Amino acid sequence: MKKKYLSLLLLCLSLVGCKTKAVVELDYLPIADPYVMLYEGKYYAYGTGGTVEGEGFACFSSDDLKSWRRESQALSATDSYGTWGFWAPEVYYVESKKKFYLFYSAEEHICVATADTPQGPFRQAVKQPIWDEKSIDTSLFIDDDGTPYLYFVRFTDGNVIWAAQMNDDLTSIKPETLTECIKVEEPWELSQDKPAKVAEGPSILKKDGVYYLVYSANHFESKNYGVGYATSDSPMGPWKKYAGNPILQRTDGLLGTGHGAPFRCKDGSWKYIFHAHWDTTKVQPRTSYIKGFAISDHGVASIDGSIIKPQVLGTASKNNE
């Protein structure tokens, strides 16, 4: 009995001399189609892949955009529609609802789930898509007058970006408002290394009464996958593509750069998170990077500046010296 207590005492004393420290678990952020939300001074990232708990979406958090920590699983397949193909999540805090909304794709259908915290767990009260037609890549925009719009991809002529007004419940659209926004038309949007009519990954911003639709084009496996934008005086278009597109393509030695989203930073500036190919010879796994995003006084959007390569931290214990 005394030996048992002595062993326990020695174990406790050894633990007192230990402490945890942050260590680099991954030297990259393991998500594609990434999205970042700033909430109460902390950044939260979501994307395709990166989960360690089965189908669904992971959540990562950061104070500085460089070092990230894995949070709990944000959404699990058991709590939502679909069993495969969980892609392109975007999370919004809707003040009028006091809820977080996660818009995403599953089984090539667009869905939405809700939670009380940015980490989740996000769940669907009724496990069903927003509408029956196959679609992907949702992005929510709520205008100054409170009208909600949903932008997403339909397979009408390749991948084509459409918009529709949402009902106030934010779980369904008004089909009669469906409007085509962006399709492949420009030479840069149809790269010959992997020709495919793909316009996808929409994001919407508004500045000085002008609406900006940021999108990606080309097949995601193409080395020339890139980002462009179009402008309009209305959230439903018509949209005029910027003559200087693409504004992001083959940057900083990276290939396949695109399908990201602009987000506001703590200091009020903007940045753009996007994914790229693993390296110059392999597409998968795609990983995420961050660059600056701005709209000039002349209304020109740009993605530039120094690049941030995020890393994921874990913890390890060490003995005090």
Identify the meaning behind each predicted range:
Residues 1-4:
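Positively charged n-region of N-terminal signal peptides that target proteins for export
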Residues 10-17:
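Hydrophobic h-region of N-terminal signal peptides that target proteins for export
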